[in-house]
Structures are given as structure tokens and as C-alpha cells.
């Protein structure tokens, strides 16, 4: 049974890891990061909904008068 030639495995694995490292560095370097992150100020808008304008009272069945 012939033996497997493993003499080129080291350089193949090393080249693969180096290539993956370079590709990942190039991908990460394309992202834009803010140098000073600040919270975004959002303006709260109050929407006028009909049931918020008028006062309504909700009666629970237990508080209704007996008939």
C-alpha cells in the first residue's frame, strides 16, 4: 500500500491560513466606524388619537349597579 505524501501539507495549510487572514482583514477594513459615537436625538411626535382626546370611563362588570 503506497504511503500518502504529506511533504506539501505544511505549505498548503500555511498559505490557506495566510490567505484567509488577508481576505478577512480586507473585508473588515472596508467598514466605516464612527470615531466618536453619540446617541441619536429623536423628536417625539404626539399623535392625536380620538380615544386619547376625550376622557372615557371603563366600567367593570362588578362595579355596575345591580338590576
From Swiss-Prot:
Keywords: Acetylation, ATP synthesis, CF(0), Hydrogen ion transport, Ion transport, Membrane, Mitochondrion, Transmembrane, Transmembrane helix, Transport
GO molecular function, one term: proton transmembrane transporter activity
Transmembrane segments: 8-24
An annotated GO BP: proton motive force-driven ATP synthesis
GO cellular component: mitochondrial membrane; proton-transporting ATP synthase complex
List of residues that carry N6-acetyllysine: 54, 57
Pfam families xrefs: ATP-synt_8
Signal sequence residues: none
Annotated localization: Mitochondrion membrane
Sites of N6-succinyllysine modification: 54
Record's bilayer topology term: Single-pass membrane protein
Description of how the protein assembles with itself and partners: F-type ATPases have 2 components, CF(1) - the catalytic core - and CF(0) - the membrane proton channel. Component of an ATP synthase complex composed of ATP5PB, ATP5MC1, ATP5F1E, ATP5PD, ATP5ME, ATP5PF, ATP5MF, MT-ATP6, MT-ATP8, ATP5F1A, ATP5F1B, ATP5F1D, ATP5F1C, ATP5PO, ATP5MG, ATP5MK and ATP5MJ. Interacts with PRICKLE3.
Family: Belongs to the ATPase protein 8 family.
Function (record text): Mitochondrial membrane ATP synthase (F(1)F(0) ATP synthase or Complex V) produces ATP from ADP in the presence of a proton gradient across the membrane which is generated by electron transport complexes of the respiratory chain. F-type ATPases consist of two structural domains, F(1) - containing the extramembraneous catalytic core and F(0) - containing the membrane proton channel, linked together by a central stalk and a peripheral stalk. During catalysis, ATP synthesis in the catalytic domain of F(1) is coupled via a rotary mechanism of the central stalk subunits to proton translocation.
Record protein name field: ATP synthase protein 8
Gene behind this protein: MT-ATP8
Amino acid at each position: 500500500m503506497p504511503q500518502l505524501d504529506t511533504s506539501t501539507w505544511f505549505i498548503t495549510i500555511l498559505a490557506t491560513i495566510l490567505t484567509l487572514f488577508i481576505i478577512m482583514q480586507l473585508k473588515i477594513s472596508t467598514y466605516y466606524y464612527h470615531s466618536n459615537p453619540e446617541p441619536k436625538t429623536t423628536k417625539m411626535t404626539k399623535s392625536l388619537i380620538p380615544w386619547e382626546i376625550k376622557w372615557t370611563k371603563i366600567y367593570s362588570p362588578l362595579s355596575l349597579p345591580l338590576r
